Amino acid sequence: MKRVLGTLFLLAAGLAFFGCTKKDENKAVKDIIAQAEKMSFQELLEKAYAESNGKEVSGIGNSSRGKTAGEKFVEEIKKVHPDYTGSIKWSQPKNNSIFEALTKDTESANPVQAVTLIQDAAQIKNKMISTGILYNFIPKEWRETAGVNIAADGNPLALQTLSKVFMYNIVDGSKKYMNVWDFVKEGEKPMFMGLDSEPVGKNFLYMLTEKKYVKYVKDAYQALSAEDKMYFDPIIREIKPKVKELNLTDDAEYSLAWIKLFVTQFNKMTDDGPISTEIVKKSAAGQTALIVYSKLRSINESEETSVNNIAVAAYQDGYEGFGGYAYKHYLQIPKNTPYPWTACAFISYMVTNKDGFQPWGKDMGGYSSNPSINQDHSRDGYVDGVDKFPAKDDRGYSWWVSPDFGRLVIEETDYCAGVQFSVGLWIDSLKK
């Protein structure tokens, strides 16, 4: 009873906090964004030059690569105006503190943050957008590019979609994981970052309760053997009442059962880096992981470690269920940005210019929201014309998000924010 009352209190508190009205809008910044959305990148570049020449423009983000993008942006201005002496100062807060940092900066007497690259859809919506701390900007040339999905990536504006995929060690060949339910069988302990260390992992679990992804989970269950179904059936039946309690779609008990097993069984790790170096070892035979796909790029080949010691689950013929999940990096403008024109130009540069996206696009597993500036990584495993590391041959965004192939579970801002204080609290009750 105490747990129920506590949950209800937290739910009410959360709704009260995040349901409050927006803070006073900054009309001047809003007006500049409205003008900027009608301008070309070159026009924005002129505005940025006039606004920030000789100034230090601060940016803050979840990705350290924003620093490289900022340096490239400055060089882009100098191509047109060699006398430009402005700079981009980039910072990367640790331990999920970016929300607090942006809030404090916005409320300070002299805000300094001009632009942000931020992740975690649920918190962005509930803490930053609904409260009016961050403003959205959609560049004209991005909006007009063929293949851009404005509905999925425009509000908030996504820089990129990043994939985290299931993989397993194949050194002794003792196990094959051909169904996403295989990763939550009795005794399985996939290596995964703790949910408090990287909350985008919780967004993945939230999205599993959305109708589209519920079908992925149920379809994978139906492909199981009769013996495997006998193991999972009691768990699914026991959890079914939660579907109504959490106001979820039909058949969500399949997703809730999978989530419960995953959350209570996974091997909690501090970061994807250590997971990636562990899963590729000969000594890690039979181990599994759910990690950022791009980590495979930095594996040092040796007698003990090799990319060829693992298999990407979704790449196996006949694999059933989702192959992993995808989260996004979003580009936003703080409401009290001191350099709104420069922020708009910088954002436009990152989503419309191949050089602007290059700090992220140079690696597999990250896909720009603008398909025209993505790089091809389908032969990243080739050495001297020979495909020596097939697991590194990225099949691309379209393959990974297809319901017929990779079936990534993709975070959606509104859905994640909407279930954070229902499904999210239930997940918290499961955590070890």
Mark where each language-model region is.
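Extracytoplasmic/periplasmic substrate-binding proteins
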Residues: 253-256, 264-336, 383
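Bacterial signal peptide processing site
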Residues: 21-23
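Conserved C-terminal helix/tail region of periplasmic/extracytoplasmic solute-binding proteins
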Residues: 30, 37, 393-432
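Positively charged n-region of N-terminal signal peptides that target proteins for export
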Residues: 1-4
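Extracytoplasmic ligand-binding site segments that recognize negatively charged/polar headgroups
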Residues: 56-75, 88-103, 111-274
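C-terminal motif of bacterial Sec signal peptides marking the signal peptidase cleavage site
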Residues: 16-19
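Immediate post-signal peptide segment of exported/extracytoplasmic ligand-binding proteins
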Residues: 25-27, 33-57, 78
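Mature extracytoplasmic/periplasmic domains
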Residues: 324-408
